[in-house]
Amino acid sequence: MAQPEDKAPEVPTEGVRLVPPQVNKADRTPLGVLSTLEPLTRLQRTWGVWHVPELDTQDAEALVGLWPLGSFLVTGRDPSQALVLRSGPLPGEVNTYQIQKIPRGVSLESSNLCMPDLPHLLAFLSASRDVLPRTLLLPPPTLGPRDEHTDPVQIGRVQQDTPGKVLSIVNQLYLETHRGWGREQTPQETEPEAAQRHDPAPRNPAPHGVSWVKGPLSPEVDHPGPALASLLEEEEEDLEGKEEGREDDPEEEGPEDVLTIHVQSLVRARSSYVARQYRSLRVRIASDSGGPHGSGDPATELLQDVRHLLTDLQDHLAKDSYIRAVFGSRGPGLPKKDEDPGPALETAVCQAVLAPLKPALWTRLRTLRAPELRRLRRRQTALRAGAGPPGAQGPGPEGQSPAPALRSRIHERLAHLHAACAPRRKVALLLEVCRDVYAGLARGENQDPLGADAFLPALTEELIWSPDIGDTQLDVEFLMELLDPDELRGEAGYYLTTWFGALHHIAHYQPETDRAPRGLSSEARASLHQWHRRRTLHRKDHPRAQANLPFKEPWAEETVTGTSDN
């Protein structure tokens, strides 16, 4: 005897099509099988899983044949769509049904039942088989709310639900396209994303992972599946990775890529807090008026505003449940330093928010610093003329400069440093340049190690022969304002002040007397001390008071009387 759930309804007379009444305000149809929204909601949330428009019918039948009874896929695009169903336990028991588009909705071929749209039709067929040999088996709500005892969803990886004996794959491309569905977000952030709900076509045709599998796979079939994390990495360009020219472990970069995509989606959602802050930053960069942190210097004020906005966004996004879930998907056993999502979140915010505005930001900084940068380049040209050919009077032992190959590598790193966006990435490249400078000082055999006294003049010479000293100056200023205060207390802060000193020597070179300053002036030292205090002193009672202290740049101090720039 047929089970109640498999019992077919009475078929209307030939030529008459059963059409349910209009959907009411609660999005429910009067049909008893759709008295609950759970099947319909599950189908809507997993649309990108069961609908694979680029898959042909033959391949779909081969895939569905490996899955449990009732498993299905929808292939093709409107109006040439087909339902592929695993209808029996024997190999090859897979049926294909054409989906017809009619004025009142959609229906299966040879069926007299019409539903408003495809999800409603599939939801009905999951409860009543109509003309099908059996009801549909819906995919699990992988992207919906999870039981509090389950493990975090493994983004882009195979995950097994032991109690339910379900093997599933979270579709990364689906997450990107339908970001607003299974994650809890603020109302203003989910509203624009919901508009994408009924656009089932993925942006790029890509190998489609198995959506759900109950029980073991057929032992006769070798079923390797591409890692969805790798598909995502091929689709999303890692700008900083291209700048560095290195290949990192994709597993390590995965969470940063996913976070970046999520933040980018929030930037596109115009009513979200992230989008509003992004627009505010764009307006601030283009504005001639000063910011709220009036230090007196327009360029410094602009960078302070950028820092406060990025910090505010990171604090806001750190509370995002989706971001916590993505970072938690990396699993247990991580080193203690990797448990903090701060570095990955900083990279994501810089890539999604700061990188699109970076050309405008640097154009604005060059405009604000134009007179000082011209003077710096004139001093650089004068120093080059006095030094002769590159390497003729280097600071190394016996007047030797770094080898040409090493100097070329230093210049390449300086270019990468300027192209980088995130402060941590810039600092990493700056420290690489420092290591190269030290390597140039220790070229000779049996040579005693050289310390900071030799490093400063060596770095100064490299900057003298740098093709883009103006960009390097702005990079140093950028880092001095945007780098995390904890970083400034360590190695990064020490070398930043050293670069400040080297640029100070070049900016205050006196071509008339052919003499560079022997050390930092008292004004420059006081300015450095004030900057360090402002950036590293935490005051809980006045968290923003430190931003109001002015900071004089290396060029702000006038040179010795008698020096003229005209």
Swiss-Prot record:
Ranges of compositional bias, category Acidic residues: 232-256
Compositionally biased intervals (Gly residues): 388-397
The keyword 4Fe-4S is assigned to this record: no
UniProt biased composition (Basic residues): 532-542
InterPro entries: SH2_dom_sf, VPS9, Vps9-like, VPS9_dom_sf
GO MF annotations, alphabetized: GTPase activator activity; guanyl-nucleotide exchange factor activity; small GTPase binding
KW Transport (keyword) present: yes
The entry's keywords: Cell projection, Cytoplasmic vesicle, Endocytosis, GTPase activation, Protein transport, Transport
SUPFAM superfamilies attached to this UniProt entry: SH2 domain (SSF55550), VPS9 domain (SSF109993)
GO BP field: endocytosis; protein transport
Highest taxon listed in the record's lineage: Eukaryota
Subcellular location: Cell projection, Ruffle; Cytoplasmic vesicle
Assigned GO CC terms: actin cytoskeleton; cytosol; endocytic vesicle; ruffle
All copies of domain VPS9, residue ranges: 370-515
Main location: other
General function of this protein: Guanine nucleotide exchange factor (GEF) for RAB5A and RAB22A that activates RAB5A and RAB22A by exchanging bound GDP for free GTP. Plays a role in endocytosis via its role in activating Rab family members.
Quaternary state and interactors: Interacts with RAB5A, RAB22A and MUSK.
PANTHER family given in the database record: RAB GDP/GTP EXCHANGE FACTOR, RAS AND RAB INTERACTOR-LIKE PROTEIN
Name of the featured protein: Ras and Rab interactor-like protein
Organism listed in the record: Homo sapiens (Human)
Gene that encodes it: RINL
